[in-house]
């Protein structure tokens, strides 16, 4: 393999041109057409998700404080740091505030850039401040404000336009998210050698948009920023494998997509681990030349170290599977020439798999144990809980949420009704038939080193990894659905499904028929999305925040459920002790202590816990103490019976809070005191 690989790029790519060229179209015109269509579908995707977001929230008619409340749970946490930077006296002072933060986890200072992957907020704030200053000096109209009448609620001022910090932020999110369609188009072209394949891929994405992304509902989430770079990285990688590239320029291109993806989302490390596994599969099948493989692994190693430094030495990056797998694949790549004499393919695959697996797991365990890093322990606990009876308080908080549960049958049904899954399976079957007819599974030969479709094998293995992730955790279907769309594009590859034996007109007619079949259910899906109309309003939370602003000190410390705490920090700027970013062992311990307010522990013990944490007020919602007869282990009462069995026979604190709220008698909950209880929703306890 090594002998052939050395000349892989010198001998020229195995396809002509930069992208595959259809007959009758010159190279430059072909490339220009592909680039322009890709940019156009990206713009359409941007417009679509922007429209869906506006329709759902009626965002243009909300006041800024309502927009802040609309960023629920961790979305509000992330946006709060953007707000901190743009309202600071200077950009550098704003960055200093978030790298020496004492508000998010009251009681100690944290570097939120290290912990929360906040580079999107830093970049957008960096762009917003000079943009706003330039607009002001040039007297540009970048924001329009008016008064909105809200019926029984007080009128508010609503401002619209790119000059508004919220609009600047969400526009940045949606511009980045729009590129997903661009990358999918390019990937469709690459795997099908056809513009029609790219169009087919994008149409599948559009027709299954609701099962492919949630950026239109949750813009500030980390995946909204990172996934476009992940899918863009996959497109670049597919191009490099297809054309057997290994130059420094291609190395830098891979790094340029990998670094933002790693900086923007903690889960990217796991996504890239699956990519490493997929590359390993293609390389071990002799489908990726040695020089190309070296370029790929160097890019991952470089991207890792750049990101590690920029995230101030994020410990979880060291302990995650991604870093060990890079070294494992590098070892496989660099020792593979020594194994060139092994012609029996199963033996060759077994040896490489043992090397790859043992190094990955060995380094993973070694780094975690040696450095005492437990930040990612909850991930393996979640996976363990899905296949065994194991459960604890932390796994329940995840697995009781639908998005962290197994994929729902309804999702499979929807993707099947639009023919996405059936056509993807047809594509896989057609490709497998063609590939297996040309490839020896038993013996490695020199001819196999020139086998085509290395990029397709990589993407199919990546699809398997993505599907596995989605089946285990429904939230991760954002990886599976786009890759199913890429796979369907294979049907436009003229070498499959009959190849040259079928006339071009017949093949084109079949593909047009496929599009018509996809559109039959796909277009109603788009209409259904566009018909979703809503208007955000949360008067109870608005009243709560008004009370906090008027009746508590600026340094008063709050605790409560994770979703509410993020909004308390964002809107009232009060210090909090817990928050929704749960991927750190320290915050998991803190949250367990805070949630003891829903346990059956003695009142005095819980009060002492709150005092030690420096909490002044606890925000409580009656729904926090609800029962669920269908899944009793998924409410706080049941979670605490499981977590703290020795106190399971005692009276639940939930019952005491509710009794005190209804009777307006604090004697049963002393030394706690209810200081806010205007309705049957939010209650504030003073510690």
UniProtKB/Swiss-Prot annotation:
GO terms for molecular function: mannosyltransferase activity. Signal peptide: none annotated. Keywords: Developmental protein, Differentiation, Endoplasmic reticulum, Glycosyltransferase, Membrane, Neurogenesis, Transferase, Transmembrane, Transmembrane helix. It is a multi-pass membrane protein. The chain crosses the membrane at residues 24-44, 170-190, 191-211, 223-243, 253-273, 276-296, 303-323, 324-344, 347-367, 415-435, 454-474. It is found in: Endoplasmic reticulum membrane. Its EC number is 2.4.1.-. GO terms for cellular component: endoplasmic reticulum membrane. It holds the Pfam family Dpy19. One of its GO terms (biological process) is nervous system development. InterPro entries: Dpy-19/Dpy-19-like (IPR018732), Dpy19 (IPR047462). Belongs to the dpy-19 family. C-mannosyltransferase that mediates C-mannosylation of tryptophan residues on target proteins such as unc-5 and mig-21. Mediates the attachment of alpha-mannose in C-C linkage to the C2 of the indole ring of tryptophan. C-mannosylation takes place in the endoplasmic reticulum and frequently found in thrombospondin (TSP) type-1 repeats and in the WSXWS motif of type I cytokine receptors. This is C-mannosyltransferase dpy-19. The lineage of its organism: Eukaryota, Metazoa, Ecdysozoa, Nematoda, Chromadorea.
């Amino acid at each position: 393999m090594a002998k052939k690989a050395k000349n892989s790029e010198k001998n020229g790519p195995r396809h002509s041109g930069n992208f595959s060229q259809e007959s009758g179209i010159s190279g430059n015109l072909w490339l220009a057409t592909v680039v322009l269509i890709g940019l156009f579908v990206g713009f359409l995707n941007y417009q679509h998700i922007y429209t869906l977001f506006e329709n759902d929230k009626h965002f243009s008619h909300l006041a800024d404080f309502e927009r802040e409340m609309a960023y629920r749970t961790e979305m509000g946490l992330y946006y709060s740091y953007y707000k901190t930077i743009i309202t600071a006296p200077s950009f550098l002072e704003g960055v200093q505030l978030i790298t020496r933060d004492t508000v998010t986890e009251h009681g100690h200072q944290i570097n939120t850039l290290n912990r929360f992957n906040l580079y999107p907020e830093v970049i957008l704030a960096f762009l917003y401040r000079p943009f706003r200053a330039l607009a002001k000096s040039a007297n540009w109209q970048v924001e329009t404000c008016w008064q909105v009448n809200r019926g029984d609620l007080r009128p508010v001022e609503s401002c619209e336009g790119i000059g508004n910090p919220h609009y600047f932020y969400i526009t940045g999110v949606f511009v980045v998210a729009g590129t997903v369609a661009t990358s999918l188009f390019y990937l469709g072209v690459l795997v099908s050698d056809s513009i029609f394949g790219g169009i087919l891929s994008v149409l599948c994405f559009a027709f299954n948009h609701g099962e492919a992304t949630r950026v239109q509902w949750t813009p500030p989430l980390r995946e909204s920023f990172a996934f476009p770079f992940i899918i863009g990285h996959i497109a670049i990688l597919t191009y490099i494998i297809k054309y057997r590239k290994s130059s420094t320029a291609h190395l830098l291109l891979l790094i340029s997509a990998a670094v933002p993806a790693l900086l923007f989302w903690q889960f990217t490390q796991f996504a890239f681990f699956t990519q490493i596994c997929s590359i390993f599969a293609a390389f071990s099948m002799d489908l990726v030349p040695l020089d190309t493989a070296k370029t790929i692994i160097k890019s991952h190693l470089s991207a890792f170290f750049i990101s590690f430094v920029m995230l101030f030495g994020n410990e979880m990056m060291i302990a995650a599977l991604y870093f060990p797998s890079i070294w494992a694949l590098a070892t496989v790549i660099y020792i593979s020439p020594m194994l060139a004499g092994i012609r029996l393919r199963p033996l060759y695959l077994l040896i490489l798999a043992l090397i790859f697996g043992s190094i990955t797991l060995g380094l993973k365990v070694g780094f975690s144990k040696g450095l005492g890093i437990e930040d990612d322990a909850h991930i393996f606990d979640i996976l363990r809980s899905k296949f065994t009876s194991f459960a604890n308080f932390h796994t329940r908080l995840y697995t009781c949420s639908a998005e962290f549960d197994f994929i729902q049958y309804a999702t499979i049904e929807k993707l099947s009704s639009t023919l996405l899954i059936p056509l993807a399976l047809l594509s896989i079957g057609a490709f497998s038939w063609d590939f297996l007819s040309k490839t020896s599974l038993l013996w490695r030969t020199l001819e196999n080193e020139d086998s085509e479709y290395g990029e397709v094998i990589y993407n199919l293995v990546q699809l398997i990894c993505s599907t596995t992730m989605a089946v285990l955790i429904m939230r991760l279907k954002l990886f599976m659905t786009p890759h199913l769309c890429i796979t369907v594009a294979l049907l436009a590859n003229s070498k499959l499904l009959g190849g040259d034996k079928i006339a071009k007109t017949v093949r084109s007619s079949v593909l047009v028929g496929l599009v018509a079949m996809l559109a039959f259910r796909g277009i109603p899906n788009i209409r259904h999305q566009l018909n979703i109309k809503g208007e955000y309003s949360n008067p109870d939370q608005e009243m709560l925040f008004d009370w906090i602003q008027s009746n508590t000190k600026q340094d008063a410390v709050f605790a409560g459920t994770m979703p509410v705490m993020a909004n308390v920090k964002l809107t009232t700027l009060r210090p909090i002790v817990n928050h929704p970013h749960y991927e750190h062992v320290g915050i998991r311990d803190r949250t367990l202590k805070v949630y003891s307010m829903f346990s059956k522990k003695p009142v005095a013990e819980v009060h002492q816990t709150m005092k030690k944490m420096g909490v002044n007020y606890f925000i409580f919602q009656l729904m926090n103490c609800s029962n669920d007869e269908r899944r009793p282990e998924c409410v706080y009462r049941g979670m605490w019976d499981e977590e703290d069995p020795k106190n399971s026979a005692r009276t639940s604190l939930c019952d005491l809070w509710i009794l005190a709220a209804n009777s307006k008698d604090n004697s049963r909950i002393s030394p706690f005191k209810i200081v806010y209880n205007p309705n049957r929703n939010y209650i504030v306890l003073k510690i």
